């Protein structure tokens, strides 16, 4: 059982609506108020079912002890499922809460119990003294105790690497590195014309990652039927609808293709590894991430948070010559897992399960690594630009390094800033704790001024030795390579987040939002005026080879059909009536050329429309329409019909 104990001036509640597991109640308990009370928010858990009487007795002891400390004889028992992710059955929860209520009354306490299984509005006024907010965990004998903080779900103690702990304590210094090559104090830097850089600097220095309100992309990802929360899973694990899956697939194929052009070989490796593997155990403590853990056959396993493990173990077993270097391998992880803090999770911005293109490059020495770093920096800029995220306006650059590396490679770091064409934030460490000496990230700044890392490259000086990775040089001697870690785009989900946030901000400025044509789930929508025009529309769609076309053949007004196409950000909308059936050209509303409330209509042939779309999407991945072509036959994934 989890208890959150609040000494309150008052607590009051009002029942609103029953859930499927609601207990039957009398009218008298549909609302309640208690003053000068100890409010006990309680969640009965699965392990409690093994010995409920023990849990009642120990819960009684815990509540009485706190009540005596705060000098009250009034207790409000309030069922609060949000304290745990491992709840008991509803029947057991009611049994334990009723047992606890009776036990408290038997000890002379004035007790009220809010009903179980009902949605309730409640108001509480906490007294605010040192003992006014306490938490307690009750476990049956033989069950391992797990402590929780107030209002946080009870979980097994999370596995936190030494790198995470160090990151929380590590001292570093922030500067602005300008295009003139000078390091400047971020507190006195003139941010005129660099509003997003200022927002990023504030975000970095405050280190506040928790979410206080929902960003616009959350509503958009649902309205566009791309993705949604999955209540049946752990927070930060999403469901993807057909349109979103198609977008993800094309982004994945694009990034893999760009890596292949640079000589990267695609591999696939396991998603879980042994925590006691001597090499992996050391690496866990050098990587700043929190892990999911799995117990199987008495083994403690962790779910990977990157593809490093599998690729490095593969590198260890390979025979590598200096002639093979630089050697690149890439894996598109579906998925990588990081147990991000619950308060930081929101939409597609920060997830616990995500799709990450993860490329590693083995280089002969530091000079070779620096050259590759510069090449991959350029690759990342170009990758995001094609996706639709521009270095000039959409993201800010962070470069992080040790002081020694900066002093030895200042001109190279300055060249990165010049390529960005704008000042960047740099973070300098006095000494190296992590496995890398240099890294950059491209950080997208959203409408709430939160930053999220996209592309990144790191120079790794530890893991070749840790994993015993070698290559044979010209003299036949074994040497350790320098390793680059690169994600050309960052997490695929974050790319979609960035596109949606960008268009939300553009819309606020009066622009017409749209996705890049190559990523739009539907590229052309054909709107029929009446049922008799449907066969012609179908024939028209058949002529549009390698274009994603759907047909709005619903029994709706033409106006509604066109408005709905606008809400879905369809790049090209064609309306078909009698005139179009008898003519050579069709009227096409071109979204990219339109203004709000002022659509741009262009007359063109079907062949001209197809040619235009093929030019806009040339050399980019193509997927067929991911949903049923007929809107009349298409199910809705979000909302009601």
UniProtKB/Swiss-Prot annotation:
Residues binding Zn(2+): 308, 360, 485
Annotated spans, Editing domain: 1-154
Swiss-Prot/TrEMBL keywords: Aminoacyl-tRNA synthetase, ATP-binding, Cytoplasm, Ligase, Metal-binding, Nucleotide-binding, Protein biosynthesis, RNA-binding, tRNA-binding, Zinc
Subcellular location: Cytoplasm
Co-factor binding details: Binds 1 zinc ion per subunit.
HAMAP family, alphabetized: Thr_tRNA_synth
Name the UniProt record assigns to this protein: Threonine--tRNA ligase
Annotated source species: Methanocella arvoryzae (strain DSM 22066 / NBRC 105507 / MRE50)
